[in-house]
Swiss-Prot record:
Higher taxonomy: Bacteria, Pseudomonadati, Pseudomonadota, Gammaproteobacteria, Enterobacterales
Complex formation: Interacts directly with the RNA polymerase.
Entry annotated with the keyword Secreted: no
Protein name, as recorded: RNA polymerase-binding transcription factor DksA
One BP annotation, GO: regulation of gene expression
Function: Transcription factor that acts by binding directly to the RNA polymerase (RNAP). Required for negative regulation of rRNA expression and positive regulation of several amino acid biosynthesis promoters.
Length: 151
């Protein structure tokens, strides 16, 4: 239950960060029309900019906190903190690459459709994870296969 609540909060935080409200479909509205494309483009660009700002801030923080402690334990703690921050930022860098790939799909009008089966991914799923490239059914199958392979 708590995990589901956190997912919903993180999905909403992406929308909040972009300064947009959840998209409201209108009756008989064409999927991935100009209005929807603009909605997701705004979300993706804001998300990418936020991640870039976070990465820049981390660099500044590491430079500010870099101290040569005489105590080896203090140095080890500091190195571990820096290592953790850098791993976190590396994940964010990879996410930026995924966002840029998704923005190219938006430009090429390939956005919003499952790469595996070609059906619509859906507005709500894309708002929850704008970089999603599989519909929920194909993603579920992919995760089941992954569990079977990895044990």
């Amino acid at each position: 239950m708590q995990k589901e609540k956190n997912k919903k909060q993180s999905s909403l935080s992406i929308l909040f960060m972009a300064g947009v409200q959840p998209y409201k479909n209108k009756k008989n509205e064409k999927y991935m029309n100009t209005k929807q494309i603009d909605h997701f483009k705004k979300i993706l660009i804001a998300w990418k900019n936020q991640l870039r700002n976070d990465i820049s801030q981390t660099r500044l923080n590491i430079q500010d906190k870099a101290t040569n402690y005489p105590d080896p334990i203090d140095r080890a703690v500091q190195e571990e903190e820096f290592s953790f921050e850098l791993r976190h930022r590396d994940r964010e860098r990879k996410l930026i690459e995924k966002i840029e790939k998704t923005l190219k799909k938006v430009e090429n009008k390939d956005f919003g459709y499952c790469e595996s089966c070609g059906i619509e991914i859906g507005i709500k799923r894309l708002e929850a994870r704008p970089t999603a490239n599989l519909c929920i059914d194909c993603k579920t199958l992919s995760e089941i296969r992954e569990k079977q392979i990895l044990g």
